[in-house]
Amino acid sequence: MNKTVLPTIDNLDHKWYVIDAEGQRLGRLATEVATILRGKNKPTFTPHMDTGDFVIIINAEKIEVTGRKREQKLYRRHSGRPGGMKEETFEKLQVRLPERIVESAVRGMLPKNSLGRKLFTKLKVYAGPSHPHAAQQPETLVINTIPAGAN
């Protein structure tokens, strides 16, 4: 009978990927990124270990949503003080902090525990087309999140 081989920290290699978010759909992109961060696309996936890769997302300011979500989708945060609830629409947040939109979408798709917090640190989001991670020699990953027939 064969034994199940669990990966060890020594034989794990974490790759770096660059994804261009220009014109991509937010939710579809976030699911793909969460899968890569978790390592579910690898044969060495183990639920309790960090087997995923690093992901750099560029052009976060040009991400798209469908329908009326641009005006209706709300992002909430709380300062911790009484009456400290702040609400902001997708449209306003995209102008002010476009990175936060992608980060919150991906964070919601990761586990809600210490492993999820560790995986989230491997996501790097930048509003513009440049990033400071050239030394890691990231591979360009093309993800097509636009369904066939959509504009």
Swiss-Prot record:
It comes from the Bacteria. GO terms for biological process: negative regulation of translation; translation. This protein is one of the early assembly proteins of the 50S ribosomal subunit, although it is not seen to bind rRNA by itself. It is important during the early stages of 50S assembly. The gene is rplM. The keyword Ribonucleoprotein applies. CDD domains: Ribosomal_L13. One of its GO terms (cellular component) is ribosome. Belongs to the universal ribosomal protein uL13 family. The keyword Ribonucleoprotein applies. GO terms for molecular function: mRNA binding; structural constituent of ribosome. Keywords: Ribonucleoprotein, Ribosomal protein. This is Large ribosomal subunit protein uL13. InterPro entries: Ribosomal_uL13, Ribosomal_uL13_bac-type, Ribosomal_uL13_CS, Ribosomal_uL13_sf.
